[in-house]
Structures are given as C-alpha cells and as structure tokens.
Amino acid sequence: MSNITMKELLEAGVHFGHQTKRWNPKMKPYIFGARNGIYIIDLQKTVRLFKGAYNFVVDAAQSGETMLFVGTKKQAQDSVSEEAQRCGMFYVNDRWLGGMLTNFSTVKQSIDRLKRLDAMVADGTIEAYTKKEALQMEKDRQKLEKTLGGIKGMNKLPGVLFVIDPKNEEIAVSEAKKLGIPVVAIVDTNCDPDDIDYVIPGNDDAIRAIRLLTSKVADAMIEGGQARNIKLQTDTEGAEFAAEAEGVVEETAGEA
C-alpha cells in the first residue's frame, strides 16, 4: 500500500492554501489556521482523508473500474498526463469540452475520427490526398489529439473521476455528479467541497503538491489493478483444476 506521510506533504507544500480573502467558508473544517494572510491546511486531516480516498480507488480498480484524471490548469497538465498514462488510465489536461461525459456518444464520434486520421497517417493512405487536403486533415488530427488524445482509448464512461482543482473543473464535476460518477479531488481553500465524494484537502496550485498527490492516486489504480489480475488468474487456475479433477473422477468411474 502506498502511504502518504506528513513529511512528504510538508516538503511538497501541500499545506499552503489560498489567501485568506479568497476562501470558501465550507473549507473551514479542513483549515488549521492562517499565516501571513495565507490559510494553512490541516495536514492531519489530509493524511486521514487521503487514506480513505486511496482505499476507495484501490477497490474501484480491483472491481475493474477505470479512472479519468482531469486537470487543465498549466501546473497540473504534465502530472495529469504522465501519471494517468503510468497507471494505464485516461486524462483530460488541455480543455474540458462540455458534454465529455453527459454527451459521450457524440464525443465518441470525434474520438473515432481521430483514430481514423491516426490510422491514415500510420499506413500512409493520407498521402493519396492532395497536399492541401492532407494538410487540413493533419491540422484536424492535431487539434483532436490535443483535446481528446488522453481519452482515445476510453470506450465507455469512467468509473471514477480524479480532479485537480474542482473550482476550475466545475463543468467536469457537474457532469460526473449528474451521471453518478464518484469524484475524488484535490480541494484547496477556495473550493466548494460539497460536490466531491472524496475530498483531499491540499494545495492545488503548486506543481510539487499536484505531482505528489496525483502519483499516489495513480499508485492506487496500479495496486487495485494488480490485485484484480491476481484474482482473475487464481480464478482461472481454480476453474481449470476443477475441470481436470472432474475429468479424472469421470475416467475412474468409467473404469470401475
């Protein structure tokens, strides 16, 4: 199990919230105090709540659920794409298109077009078009890749949403809520925690803080996925053994 320590949180600056004048009163239970006009997040609560979020993600992955990582602000983009890919999951780190979840069937059509354009580039069939047509198609492909590249392999709605800064990603959170998709999020002192199922109180602006928490969530997906694979393998071996044993019994009975 990937634990998170107070030392790691402090070194990454997870405890630094927003200026006291820019806060959401609903975050009061997660605030330790203020220093130099900045709210300080109660890291003891972060450790406890992160553990709950981590266990939830492990269980979700073990059940075969997928996760969509969402973080479109500049500080989050690299961590979101790299950690999502490391655990074999999906991500949105450029721009959230309205309806990405609630109108997924339409978004899927754009994903399919992106896949077709990728295939044309890969097998060279794009060269059969005029130079002008090929350039336009490549331009379209790059535009689609930028917004949809991270969900190219997502054939159905995700089981869990992991969000960095729900205030910035309020449309994504709203869509998940409408569809009953659980949301795990890094929630800073200026955010509304009410729509978040698993609140991780923390700094959602510092790159190191985002990287630390995102990598730990990716670890949870990996842990759950590995446990699922072991169980599936054990179940398969058990079924094969049972079938073999049944065959031996039948053979023995026949000889008798």
Curated annotation (Swiss-Prot):
Family: Belongs to the universal ribosomal protein uS2 family.
Matching SUPFAM superfamilies: Ribosomal protein S2 (SSF52313)
Entry keyword annotation includes Ribosomal protein: yes
MF terms in GO: structural constituent of ribosome
Protein name listed in UniProt: Small ribosomal subunit protein uS2
NCBIfam families associated with the record: rpsB_bact
Source species, domain of life: Bacteria
The gene coding this protein: rpsB
Record keywords: Ribonucleoprotein, Ribosomal protein
Gene Ontology biological-process annotations: translation
Record keyword Transcription regulation present: no
GO cellular component assignments: cytosolic small ribosomal subunit
